[in-house]
Amino acid sequence: GMFILPPFASAGNKSFYSGRVEALKANMGFIARSTEEYILFADCNNIVNIDIDELMDYHTDKAADITIVYKHGKCPRLQNNMAFSFDDDSRVRMVAMSPASDTIVDYSMNIILMKKSLLQRLVNDAVSMNHESFERDIIQSNVEKLRIYGFEAKGFSLTVDSMQSYFDANMQLLDPDNCK
């Protein structure tokens, strides 16, 4: 099933987490109780038409530790956005953080698939080292140690990074072909 995790550090707190590592750590009890073997997490500012079964099959076929959905195009203006370089087998070989927004790159859509046990280990290790950035401290620093692969979002996909892109995305969703 799908679960939406809270964006705030605690019920009475109105401040956001300082980073994805802190957010995941705060929800680790919920994640630990989950009976699912895999975790797929995604940011809420993406509009993507993707077959999750195809993503799961790809992840399994590659024997990947982590699979990240990416898009080839102009990089959105987001903090801690990742851009990738791949080998011929789509394995991530280099991660650049927050590339210039006017460049054409293979950028992360922040849709990430991995085993629950790996996520728990990576988050606990990051917390013990006082790390906050999932992208920099977990993904970028483990490119050589883990089998991290990219899965290209080839269908309709957008990242909302401004009021204008929010408007543009809504206008594009009026086209029935984009909703198939």
Give the location of each predicted region.
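A generic structural signal for alpha->beta connector loops
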Residues: 1, 63, 145-147
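Short, conserved catalytic or adaptor-binding loops enriched in Gly and charged residues
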Residues: 1-3, 85-87, 140-143
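Conserved N-terminal catalytic core of the sugar/cofactor nucleotidyltransferase
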Residues: 1-47, 52-54
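Conserved beta-strand termini and adjacent loop/short-helix elements that scaffold enzyme active sites
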Residues: 5-7, 69, 151-153
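A short acidic, often aromatic-flanked loop/helix-cap motif at beta-alpha or helix-coil junctions
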Residues: 10-15, 75, 101, 157-158
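Short, surface-exposed amphipathic charged segments that create phosphate/polyanion-binding patches used
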Residues: 15-22, 81-85, 164-170
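Conserved core of the sugar-phosphate nucleotidyltransferase
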Residues: 35, 47-120
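Catalytic-core segments of class I nucleotidyltransferases/pyrophosphorylases
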Residues: 40, 56, 91-179
